[in-house]
Amino acid sequence: MKGLTYYIDRLYANPKGTIIPNDVKRILVCRPNGRLGNQLLITPLIQELSETFPNCTIDLFVKGNLASFLFENYNNVDRIIRLPGKPFKELGKYIGVWWSLRKYKYDIAINIVPNSSSGRLSACLTRSRFKFLGDLEDERSVSHTELQHMAKFPVYSIRKILSQFSIPNKERPIQEMDIKLSQAELANGKKVLESIVTNPEKETICIYTFATGGKCYSKTWWEEVYKKLNSAYAEKYNILEVLPKENISQINFKAPSWYSLDIREMGAVIANTKIFISADCGVMHLASAVHTPTVGLFSSNNINRYAPYNNGSIAINTNTTGAAELIEVIEHLLHKH
């Protein structure tokens, strides 16, 4: 795969021609990854493309079924081209989806992640006039925090590429992550939340204690945090734990808990809470994408790439921040918002 993409990279290294923004009608965005967080992280790019190319429709090449729900309120997102979640169990379908990339013509095909071989290959397979593979040329190794973040890098990348086609960079702020919840969804989320919490008259602090692999904090760690959280805020706030589909609670279900199979309903409930606290995971990014101030907990060195991204959120390095200091951060955010 790497050898093939190396050849393709050389073939499409310097696209030539003219791009007139109002004439761009169809764009393909390639992010063949099925994780919730990774698909949410492309929402700022989709918004950027919609502003830059006002007459375009956007197709997405992804993995799994999540994108259909995440982007259902994006009016200019059209086709969701989905790789099956388990390709070896659906090999024929998997191959067929790859070949379907040749079915439609695009003005622009964009790969999101530079080191994704499947993303680069999918962009190059298309019948597209311009194929952008995600590189920032001399800025690929830049250490600037803004460029490291996976919600921001694709936007900076496309801005730099388009500047080479004399499309001006307006230097506007990069949009927040957003699943565009409707007013009806938000109202239903409020109704669901009020049916769960102990006192609907109080605002709610929401926690999510699960994460995959090494990102998941121990029960001992979470129980210490919950004890301090409960001591500091139980009188003034409800505390709600949103559960994963595995029905696992790192605080042994000591707080009222709730789960939904509907990812948009889950987002709508979180949107009606005061603050959201979670380790690095897809649901953390979901909280950011519904504009709830989010405290993201990190113990690895990828904090600059995957910190919760919205106005009011913060990433905490738990290697240097203990439970007491975490409560101080939460206190600051509660008063700020």
Locate each region found by the language model.
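Donor-binding and catalytic core of enzymes assembling or modifying cell-surface/extracellular glycoconjugates
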Residues: 95, 217-301
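Nucleotide-sugar donor-binding patch of glycosyltransferase catalytic domains
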Residues: 133, 147-148, 285-337
